[in-house]
Amino acid sequence: MTVSGPGTPEPRPSDPGASSAEELRKEGNELFKCGDYEGALTAYTQALSLGATPQDQAILHRNRAACHLKLEDYSKAESEASKAIEKDGGDVKALYRRSQALEKLGRLDQAVLDLKRCVSLEPKNKVFQESLRNIGGQIQEKVRYMSSTDAKVEQMFQILLDPKEKGTEKKQKASQNLVVLAREDAGAEKIFRSNGVQLLQRLLDTGETDLMLAALRTLVGICSEHQSRTVATLSVLGTRRVVSILGVENQAVSLAACHLLQVMFDALKEGVKKGFRGKEGAIIVDPARELKVLISNLLELLTEIGVSGQGRDNALTLLIKMVPRKSPKDPNNSLTLWVIDQGLKKILEVGGSVPEAAGELTVTANSRMSASILLSKLFDDLKCDAERENFHRLCENYIRSWFEGQGLAGKLRAIQTVSCLLQGPCDAGNRALELSGVMESVIALCASEQEEEQLVAVEALIHAAGKAKRASFITANGVALLKDLYKGSERDSIRIRALVGLCKLGSAGGTDFSMKQFAEGSTLKLAKQCRKWLCNDQIDAGTRRWAVEGLAYLTFDADVKEEFVEDEAALKALFQLSRSEERSVLFAVGSALVNCTNSYDYEEPDPKMVELAKYAKQHVPEQHPKDKPSFVRARVKKLLAAGVVSAMTCMVKTESPVLTNSCRELLSRVFLALVEEVEDRGTVVAQGGGKALLPLALEGTDVGQTKAAQALAKLTITSNPEMTFPGERIYEVVRPLVSLLHLSCSGLQNFEALMALTNLAGISERLRQKILKEKAVPMIEGYMFEEHEMIRRAATECMCNLAMSKEVQDLFEAQGNDRLKLLVLYSGEDDELLRRAAAGGLAMLTSMRPSLCSRIPQVTTHWLEILQALLLSPNPELQHRGTVVVLNMMESSKEIASTLMESEVLEILSVLAKGEESPVTRAAAACLEKAVEYRLIQPNQDGE
């Protein structure tokens, strides 16, 4: 009996609608046999919708279960099998499939019950008996593990809570063992059921750093992906208590609490872990309510006095990760709307905090930037004008409340809040700038004698210059003021900010060589001063960040780029600053590097359109002579020599909300520029570029992920993938490469992805399975029909390597498709490289699947001519592939061998067999020996 694929029903009388349902079921069966499990699933679903009989419904449900098993969606497989069993309790196939799904879900006790039922229904079925023995062994092993774990858990808690063991090595080892045990599902469950949460609460109450870290990390294991345990833990510890740990001064403890809260949030939002679904009924709660309680406490923490700056940053980081939707396809943004209504003012309070002012919140250098990012994420998550208008109204009301009637301190906070908005949701910031008196106060405070007031005002002026309309206003009204501050102020902190304002205004023309805001040479002088401050170690990192901001704007000018890459000291200072705790510098560093490598999107204008624009007296942007490819390549080499890859690798590893998706995109663009030249790729790999590109290709903006994936493809093509991506990392490369096969990507990206996948497919069966799992085969097949010869060739080469997999061989062997015909026809094309790939695939397939040999004469009448052309080719590789195909065909059938020997193939093989010793002569000789064996030809008298 077969239990792995869709079943065949017993004959039954037909009824209305049954014929179409029957056709769909048969279609689904064929698709299943071909490996198209999603297509089969669709066919079975359509058949169910046609109102089939209960018997048919049971068959269709169990067939859907088989599809879900193949697609590794075990929860749905269990559900479908259960529906089949409800219709027919004696459906042994459905019972077996449900047991397979339950086993994968870890619910072994339930899987055993189904298997016992299967054995009782079919006692002689060896498949059922073997499966029952395997699961029985797994259950016994789990029981032994759990019983031995009981004593270990009790012993570890005794050591940790014993006051006599304070600071001993024994206590440290016990805490480490507890954390390790909690990482396993069974261990976490054991700790939880052994009153572990209450005991861990006692560890938290000790106040000792080591014990608190051990407790928090153990709680991470207990709560990870398990909703009921998470709710129980929050109930015992109290949500307020857990959140309050974020605010402690110790950074390690605060980070551990941040990780725990992230895990708790994931468990609440994503729901139940599949492996423990059967045990979730212990606690019935509303996850949405628990979620809001958790977020509400985080919002309260933002404005609490006594909370550490690091704790406030961690709370903002959690809100950034928790609240906005992961994808715009998700229609529900209610959590974002709730946070805006309940907590927007609290977020603005952090963003508007004025450092060193009396009564202000404790913040770090990154706090206000994190608040800006959170505000930006919330604003971007809004779906309609009404929601955005509400956001604007709340922001404006908050700013007015401080600006009007709160004196100078209130005006400073209002202006600081506007700066925060300008760095985040700039639309809201620009609207706030238009409020009565705000811009005038900014200009007036720039001339204040108090450093704090000047800092706030100048920063607001810099951020306000971001829009062209605002920049032109400030150029007309504020440039003189900024110049006076730059030249006249005695404080470096003021001078450097004024300089950045001038830099920003000076770069308003972007890369357009013909648009210059300042006189010739002024931008070079500004850049020189920025580099001077950047290299000054005596200035704190927060102030030096502004020098990088200035360079990020000035490097639009190619002259500035050339001088910057020549200044080794400035480059080293830039890279060193990017590794510092001053995380808010990351975007500016990325912008400067994008400008230096010209890795922004640029399209050559149509010459005819340029002439038309000139005739119409319209402005036409001009490219700087030093932005030509030869200059760009030289700059890239200088950056590589200065260690840019190592610096960028450190930036990618940054766990901070400041590393936004936009920042990731900048880094992806730079990496792509760095690997453009083949000779530079070894340097990038040696400095860790391959490892850094993986997270960039998996997370970020669509453009950023595509750029990073293309850089990965370039590295995979020219470097040994096993050296570039050692260990398990090589399997992570597949998904980004497959993403480049989508039609939205350019032809070059498609081509490079195909070449990279070809290399990976030739390494191991596990990699080929990973490519198949990512559903790349249909896309690769599509590109085999591409008009562009290089893409068509690359797709064929990739398919040739994938043909080593059983699943791909099944696709070629399936009836009703032209896959084999395409390879045969391509083996006769004029493109020699395409012929080599197609003939190689044909040789492999006929070797692995002899049944395909008999189908070659059926796919085209020109098959014999194509084989003869391969045998007569001057290229030894094509000759070898041709002789192997002929040998495989002769070994598969005497009839085919007879047809071949009656043609000119015999004469060609005879000539080839007499050549010098080579794979071709050996294969040709084997063909002739097979013909002799079949008695189709006679051996020579001398035995040759």
Swiss-Prot record:
It holds the Pfam family UNC45-central. The modification N6-acetyllysine is found at residues 70, 483. GO terms for molecular function: Hsp90 protein binding. Transmembrane segments: none annotated. It comes from the Eukaryota. It is found in: Cytoplasm; Cytoplasm, Perinuclear region; Nucleus. GO terms for cellular component: cytoplasm; nucleus; perinuclear region of cytoplasm. Interacts with PGR isoforms A and B as well as with NR3C1 in the absence of ligand, and with HSP90AB1. Binding to HSP90AB1 involves 2 UNC45A monomers per HSP90AB1 dimer. This is Protein unc-45 homolog A. It comes from Rattus norvegicus (Rat). The gene is Unc45a.
